[in-house]
Amino acid sequence: MDQDGFNNKFLTLGNELVLTPRFNPTSQMVTYLSYFKNLPRVYLLDIETGTQEVVGDFPGMTFAPRFSPDGKKIIMSFAKDGKSDIYTMDLQNRIVERITNHPSIDTSPSYSPDGKYITFNSDRSGYQQIYIMKSNGSDVKRISFGNGLYGTPVWSPRGDLIAFTKLHKGKFYIGVMRTDGKGERLLTENYYQEAPSWSPNGRVL
């Protein structure tokens, strides 16, 4: 659809649950999660041709696929061995690489614009908070320390901010913070607002 909500065009048939659609850097492809026949699969969809392709068929729950800044990989999380970790898939050779390996729930990964870092949420501290790490999974740092639960972090295309969802006292908030966790600002307050997404210029959520 257009950014004003008009000119809707359906890309999927609507007979299965489809979640977290994300554009590639050229806006020609979309990756998303579909539960066709109750099986979680990661798809690629060519917007011009309408061609859909399964690129990931994993045995456990899969969450939030998203392109790398160069469009060559998809980053996601899925459940394996009784826990949820972050993985990448090379779209050329379909090789899957495990990025985190921790007895916690790591999910909702998002690359920095230069591809050198990843932000994600994890409950490894005891409750859900936001972390950053290098793209190879090293140097993990927690950056959120406020009250409540933090999730769905997404790096701004400008590289200066991370947007997130916060749940506190039964309410959802959309907020932003600097990449070191400082300067947290809550922008909206509602019971059903979550999972922010940036405009390409990094100025609008």
Region spans (language model):
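Multi-bladed beta-propeller domains
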Residues: 1-19, 45-63, 89-107, 133-151, ...
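Structural motif
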Residues: 38-43, 83-87, 127-131, 170-175
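A charged, solvent-exposed segment within the mature domains of Sec-exported extracytoplasmic proteins
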Residues: 63, 69-70, 77-79, 84-85, ...
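Beta-strand C-termini and the immediately following turn/loop, strongest in propeller blades
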Residues: 1, 11-12, 30-37, 56, ...
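A short, hydrophobic/aromatic-rich structural module that often spans a beta strand
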Residues: 16, 22-33
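Short coil/turn segments that connect the beta-strands within blades of beta-propeller domains
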Residues: 26-28, 70-72, 114-116, 158-160, ...
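Ankyrin-repeat and related helical/solenoid repeat scaffolds used for protein-protein interactions
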Residues: 158, 165-205
